[in-house]
Amino acid sequence: MHHRMNEMNLSPVGMEQLTSSSVSNALPVSGSHLGLAASPTHSAIPAPGLPVAIPNLGPSLSSLPSALSLMLPMGIGDRGVMCGLPERNYTLPPPPYPHLESSYFRTILPGILSYLADRPPPQYIHPNSINVDGNTALSITNNASALDPYQSNGNVGLEPGIVSIDSRSVNTHGAQSLHPSDGHEVALDTAITMENVSRVTSPISTDGMAEELTMDGVAGEHSQIPNGSRSHEPLSVDSVSNNLAADAVGHGGVIPMHGNGLELPVVMETDHIASRVNGMSDSALSDSIHTVAMSTNSVSVALSTSHNLASLESVSLHEVGLSLEPVAVSSITQEVAMGTGHVDVSSDSLSFVPPSLQMEDSNSNKENMATLFTIWCTLCDRAYPSDCPEHGPVTFVPDTPIESRARLSLPKQLVLRQSIVGAEVGVWTGETIPVRTCFGPLIGQQSHSMEVAEWTDKAVNHIWKIYHNGVLEFCIITADENECNWMMFVRKARNREEQNLVAYPHDGKIFFCTSQDIPPENELLFYYSRDYAQQIGVPEHPDVHLCNCGKECNSYTEFKAHLTSHIHNHLPTQGHSGSHGPSHSKERKWKCSMCPQAFISPSKLHVHFMGHMGMKPHKCDFCSKAFSDPSNLRTHLKIHTGQKNYRCTLCDKSFTQKAHLESHMVIHTGEKNLKCDYCDKLFMRRQDLKQHVLIHTQERQIKCPKCDKLFLRTNHLKKHLNSHEGKRDYVCEKCTKAYLTKYHLTRHLKTCKGPTSSSSAPEEEEEDDSEEEDLADSVGTEDCRINSAVYSADESLSAHK
């Protein structure tokens, strides 16, 4: 193959022509240009594609402030060779330049498209220095942080660059091994340096010559030659005519490309130079500069805008496992097409996997820049991923903290301090607060899906239940300071002495009202009003839990544990078993110390004790009734749902409870199988038996002042007095009959069919009288008018009649 040496004209104003002297008896080194010295006119390009020549950089090459460093990919592994484009100057802004995260082809393509559109090329930004040094083993380490793409001083130029490819030979076919025919081993040594430049020169020939992108190499010794004693030969760029034979490509390794001159303003960025070979520094590059020993054989890499890759074959360096693939850039799709050649992998070689490169858009490029560089130094006028290495970290001034809504809404008469009840924050008075001073309403997050069972800890006032007509409507949650006002910090009193606020609901809101004059330096402590405490099922007073034995408990857990000590685990006496049978005496062995009732389990006894203490935590959602036993609540809910699963087999009546059905069946059978444990009397209904047992067990008796009847409860006596006074407040709307209690009126309405005749009126009145007697828990005696038998209860007398 014929080679023609051309001089490389990098001639900005006041710059001499570049030459390089030989080292170790080597030929002088000179660069070639891309055509004529004059700048080309913007004419149409007849042929799609134009090669770019890569000149050799001589050993005496000094700093060039107006030369452009061009890195072309040497394969799929982001390695390349530098070249200079002479005679075409484009002014670049002074350094430093912001770093752009983009691919190599992303930056070279706009220059090509700008020329095709008859527009001046855009300005490009170049890294400061990229050093890649390699040996036969190609020990590459990914150290992107060590590559500083900026130049701190104002000297912009091309530092001494090296393109050294030692001991290499190219055979006639690109896919064959590139080692010499004499059989000795091939060593590859490469060193590349990139520098920022301020001007670009690119004269292109117009005489119809086809330019080649050519790299020539020869075989050398296996051992690495020292930098000072290395032999050098020129690296030349050949130009061939348009009618170059096709076999010249195969034998010479040169890829011809036809067409007029094409400007290639090129940008090289560090994101595709992620690999760096250790062992060579900038000082080493300045001290020892060596070139390449080349032969007539050549390795060619072509770059074109639209090139047929079918005629290109991959060139493989088998000794180091590096494959040079033909690369084409499409100006239409803006995609990079890689060759389909494979990479030769050996045990002692570095393998490069062909990537599929995709052009990035401008938006993603900006996002990458924002992710990588977060700190902007105004003195350096550039961005850094962390603190500036020269000026250090910047000074940040934080915003003034904004307090929460709860703290900002605190009245000026109050302050926030440590609470005395154990909470973190409490509300204290700064001045005297008079009695009947109201605060509110309480502001918080409303929740309509809050279940009753979820509020298990009654001591924590983070959830406030709001009822409407006895039904839970919603809850106010006071857990977030940004959603609540200052009232969320008011704590609950532990006893009556601490309480100075009363919390009560009004119109779906919670208000606090002072119950006494509160002097300064006192904490606001609330407790619920009587009605609200009944609604939510808590004690009406915040006193400590006091047992009948005199023991004071500060918490319900302590009180519950104390009640266990009162449980007497003993069997009832044989005389008290009576007709209940042995099964009852064995099952009900847990007796209450406050009443004669016994239970089959200690848990039932605990629930029973809660009834003695007035604690009813289980509240009905449909009405205001509360229960100490959850089973009673479940039974009560059947009243609202109308569920009656127990039906009488002898009539059409149905009942919500099994016990009610059993009591009803006695009416049909007439059996008296319930016997008193203290006497021999028998009863049909369990309710009658309980009423009778009170005669033997209850000591306190209330006597009617108008008659000799005795009563166990005051409310029963009041109802009895109404019978003496003739007060019947419950009137039937159908027949105008009146009754003492609502219960009797309800029972009458089930059978009332309207106004009754006069003959049946006395009978109905007699029934009413007997019903009135049922209300009295009397322990007195009644004489039968038929005989002299004496009965202790009215119902027993009625049954006797």
Curated annotation (Swiss-Prot):
<dbReference type="InterPro" id="IPR001214">
    <property type="entry name" value="SET_dom"/>
</dbReference>
<dbReference type="InterPro" id="IPR046341">
    <property type="entry name" value="SET_dom_sf"/>
</dbReference>
<feature type="compositionally biased region" description="Acidic residues">
    <location>
        <begin position="762"/>
        <end position="776"/>
    </location>
</feature>
<dbReference type="Pfam" id="PF00096">
    <property type="entry name" value="zf-C2H2"/>
</dbReference>
<dbReference type="GO" id="GO:1990226">
    <property type="term" value="F:histone methyltransferase binding"/>
</dbReference>
<dbReference type="GO" id="GO:0000981">
    <property type="term" value="F:DNA-binding transcription factor activity, RNA polymerase II-specific"/>
</dbReference>
<dbReference type="InterPro" id="IPR017124">
    <property type="entry name" value="PRDM4"/>
</dbReference>
<dbReference type="Pfam" id="PF21549">
    <property type="entry name" value="PRDM2_PR"/>
</dbReference>
<keyword id="KW-0949">S-adenosyl-L-methionine</keyword>
<dbReference type="InterPro" id="IPR036236">
    <property type="entry name" value="Znf_C2H2_sf"/>
</dbReference>
<dbReference type="GO" id="GO:0005634">
    <property type="term" value="C:nucleus"/>
</dbReference>
<feature type="domain" description="SET">
    <location>
        <begin position="412"/>
        <end position="529"/>
    </location>
</feature>
<comment type="function">
    <text>May function as a transcription factor involved in cell differentiation.</text>
</comment>
<keyword id="KW-0862">Zinc</keyword>
<keyword id="KW-0805">Transcription regulation</keyword>
<keyword id="KW-0479">Metal-binding</keyword>
<feature type="zinc finger region" description="C2H2-type 1; atypical">
    <location>
        <begin position="545"/>
        <end position="566"/>
    </location>
</feature>
<feature type="zinc finger region" description="C2H2-type 5">
    <location>
        <begin position="702"/>
        <end position="724"/>
    </location>
</feature>
<comment type="similarity">
    <text>Belongs to the class V-like SAM-binding methyltransferase superfamily.</text>
</comment>
<feature type="zinc finger region" description="C2H2-type 4">
    <location>
        <begin position="674"/>
        <end position="696"/>
    </location>
</feature>
<keyword id="KW-0489">Methyltransferase</keyword>
<dbReference type="GO" id="GO:0006366">
    <property type="term" value="P:transcription by RNA polymerase II"/>
</dbReference>
<dbReference type="InterPro" id="IPR044404">
    <property type="entry name" value="PRDM4_PR/SET"/>
</dbReference>
<feature type="region of interest" description="Disordered">
    <location>
        <begin position="751"/>
        <end position="782"/>
    </location>
</feature>
<keyword id="KW-0808">Transferase</keyword>
<feature type="zinc finger region" description="C2H2-type 3">
    <location>
        <begin position="646"/>
        <end position="668"/>
    </location>
</feature>
<keyword id="KW-0804">Transcription</keyword>
<dbReference type="InterPro" id="IPR041493">
    <property type="entry name" value="PRDM4_Znf"/>
</dbReference>
<dbReference type="GO" id="GO:0008270">
    <property type="term" value="F:zinc ion binding"/>
</dbReference>
<keyword id="KW-0677">Repeat</keyword>
<keyword id="KW-0238">DNA-binding</keyword>
<feature type="zinc finger region" description="C2H2-type 2">
    <location>
        <begin position="618"/>
        <end position="640"/>
    </location>
</feature>
<protein>
    <recommendedName>
        <fullName>PR domain zinc finger protein 4</fullName>
        <ecNumber>2.1.1.-</ecNumber>
    </recommendedName>
</protein>
<dbReference type="GO" id="GO:0003677">
    <property type="term" value="F:DNA binding"/>
</dbReference>
<dbReference type="InterPro" id="IPR050331">
    <property type="entry name" value="Zinc_finger"/>
</dbReference>
<feature type="zinc finger region" description="C2H2-type 6; atypical">
    <location>
        <begin position="730"/>
        <end position="752"/>
    </location>
</feature>
<dbReference type="GO" id="GO:0008168">
    <property type="term" value="F:methyltransferase activity"/>
</dbReference>
<keyword id="KW-0539">Nucleus</keyword>
<dbReference type="Pfam" id="PF18445">
    <property type="entry name" value="Zn_ribbon_PRDM4"/>
</dbReference>
<dbReference type="InterPro" id="IPR013087">
    <property type="entry name" value="Znf_C2H2_type"/>
</dbReference>
<dbReference type="GO" id="GO:0032259">
    <property type="term" value="P:methylation"/>
</dbReference>
<keyword id="KW-0863">Zinc-finger</keyword>
